[in-house]
Amino acid sequence: MALSLSGLILPKLMQQRAFSVSSAVSAIQKLTRVRVVDNSTLGNAHHHRPPKVIHVYNKNGVGKVGDRVLLAIKGQKKKAIIVGHKMPGARMTPRFDSNNVVLIEDNGNPTGTRIKAPLPTHLRKLEGEYSKLLAIAQRFV
């Protein structure tokens, strides 16, 4: 099928968009770049490559606030907890400017002693799992 424009015949391909129309932000999934917001030595080290998610520990593989992920950071594999993401969530939940994570050890203890970014207040409802994170947090949103 062709389109006639003042005697010229243009192929159908010219009518397609030249830019992506997918959603601007998405949740955290594999290969998502994240920002480490605690004061651990590994998180504060200068990265020539940003930390990336290599696995999300839930059923559907899409991470939200409070989910555990596995990161590739400075050539190492480290576990982390998502404490903020760019994707808009339910009403009255904050949307952050970056995808924030806090590094944790295998037993669930945070690696750092302070969290530099504010945490969403709805993590307080889940305080059993995140009590150690909430204890070292400085601000809540």
Curated annotation (Swiss-Prot):
SMART domains: Ribosomal_L14 (SM01374). One of its GO terms (cellular component) is mitochondrion. GO terms for biological process: translation. It is found in: Mitochondrion. Residues 1-19 form a transit peptide. InterPro entries: Ribosomal_uL14, Ribosomal_uL14_sf. GO terms for molecular function: structural constituent of ribosome. Keywords: Mitochondrion, Ribonucleoprotein, Ribosomal protein, Transit peptide. It comes from the Eukaryota. Coiled coil: none annotated. Its main location: mitochondrion. Pfam families: Ribosomal_L14. The keyword Ribonucleoprotein applies. Belongs to the universal ribosomal protein uL14 family. May form part of 2 intersubunit bridges in the assembled ribosome. Upon binding to MALSU1, intersubunit bridge formation is blocked, preventing ribosome formation and repressing translation. PANTHER family: 39S RIBOSOMAL PROTEIN L14, MITOCHONDRIAL (PTHR21037), LARGE RIBOSOMAL SUBUNIT PROTEIN UL14M (PTHR21037:SF3). Component of the mitochondrial ribosome large subunit (39S) which comprises a 16S rRNA and about 50 distinct proteins. Interacts with MALSU1. This is Large ribosomal subunit protein uL14m. It comes from Danio rerio (Zebrafish). The lineage of its organism: Eukaryota, Metazoa, Chordata, Craniata, Vertebrata.
